[in-house]
Amino acid sequence: MSRRGTAEKKTAKSDPIYRNRLVNMLVNRILKHGKKSLAYQIIYRAMKKIQQKTETNPLSVLRQAIRGVTPDIAVKARRVGGSTHQVPIEIGSTQGKALAIRWLLGASRKRPGRNMAFKLSSELVDAAKGSGDAIRKKEETHRMAEANRAFAHFR
């Protein structure tokens, strides 16, 4: 048994303008090469664009997008008797949100467009409406889990 204590769970801090943890999680995932101020600029510009496009609160659009993209179940590779099986596992809320943010940013980076703020705002609006690349990724993950349901007992 380990003599070290268990690590404390870190709670995500909230960002300075919207006072929201999801925005801060998004900022920390969009961050590249330690340029946090640039990450904040991109996020806030994207929020302004969402405000202009939808004429609603951008935080509610963000919450709706993340709720729509968050997966309930995913597959994990598990080696059993020389062969690798994709075993479906349930995902907790924190891990699900982290995956959703990662997928949203990945989908927005792939989008053609002028700048990251524009691409991110478009992806968030699409995800809130129930379309877009990130939603497709979630559905694909759920399909994979459903197809490999027979291996659920390997969990």
From Swiss-Prot:
Gene Ontology BP term (one): translation
GO molecular function, one term: structural constituent of ribosome
Localization per Swiss-Prot or TrEMBL: Plastid, Chloroplast
GO cellular-component term (any): chloroplast
UniProt keyword list: Chloroplast, Plastid, Ribonucleoprotein, Ribosomal protein, RNA-binding, rRNA-binding
Source superkingdom: Eukaryota
CDD domains: uS7_Chloroplast
Predominant localisation class: plastid
Subunit relationships: Part of the 30S ribosomal subunit.
Role played: One of the primary rRNA binding proteins, it binds directly to 16S rRNA where it nucleates assembly of the head domain of the 30S subunit.
Matching PANTHER family: RIBOSOMAL PROTEIN S7
NCBIfam families xrefs: rpsG_bact
Family from the record: Belongs to the universal ribosomal protein uS7 family.
Protein's name according to its UniProt entry: Small ribosomal subunit protein uS7cz/uS7cy
Species assigned in the record: Lotus japonicus (Lotus corniculatus var. japonicus)
Gene name of the record: rps7-A
